[in-house]
Amino acid sequence: MKNICVWSVFGLLTVGSAVQAQTTNTTDKSPAPTTMPKTADKEARRGELLATFGGCHDCHTPKVMTPKGPQPDTSRLLSGYPSNASLPAVPQGVIGPTQWGALASNDLTAWAGPWGISFAANLTPDVTGLGHWTAQDFIHTMRTGKHLGMGRALLPPMPWFDSAVLTDQDLKALFKYLRSLKPISNQVPQPIPPQATAAH
């Protein structure tokens, strides 16, 4: 009798496992990732995942318009606001305490708000981007929210306060990924202060 119970339990577990595996295989229709990390170096690959998950491409990569909406322009990864782009005018009376909080350019690389107009930085290793930066410069900037850790404040929508909680190891991995990108010459303009926003 004891053997029958043991074999019955074993049989039920086996059948249950098979049903579970079959159910999982047939009902799990999660889409496969559309892009897999391409960076060969393990630390840089981790940085690439952090950049992707952290939304760096949302603002720092110019977009191309597709039937599904704006998509990252993979030929200009993380190169920031295109220096040859024409900046649309900011409508008067649209941004304010009882109005909209911010407006974005069509490719989401320029933002207007109470702070003025900010432009997504070039994060590639070109001299017009992070070419002269060290890992320590990058870490200090991400920790303080100030350009090179002592310059002007990083403006919205840059969520530096979220990046500030990353470990030094994570920030070094992110910087290593940025250094692995194709250098793109693109001198991003300086921010435009609120009082000059009306002229644009």
Role assignments for model-derived ranges:
Residues 47, 53-63, 138, 174, ...:
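The canonical Cys-X-X-Cys-His
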Residues 7-16:
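Bacterial N-terminal signal peptides
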Residues 19-23:
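Boundary at the C-terminal end of the N-terminal hydrophobic targeting segment
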Residues 65-140, 154-167, 197-200:
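Gly/Gly-Pro-rich "capping" loops immediately C-terminal to redox-active cysteine motifs
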Residues 42, 63, 153, 170, ...:
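Ligand-binding pocket scaffold of soluble enzyme catalytic domains
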Residues 27-52, 64-70, 89-90, 132:
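Electrostatic cytochrome c docking/interface patches
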Residues 1-4:
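Positively charged n-region of N-terminal signal peptides that target proteins for export
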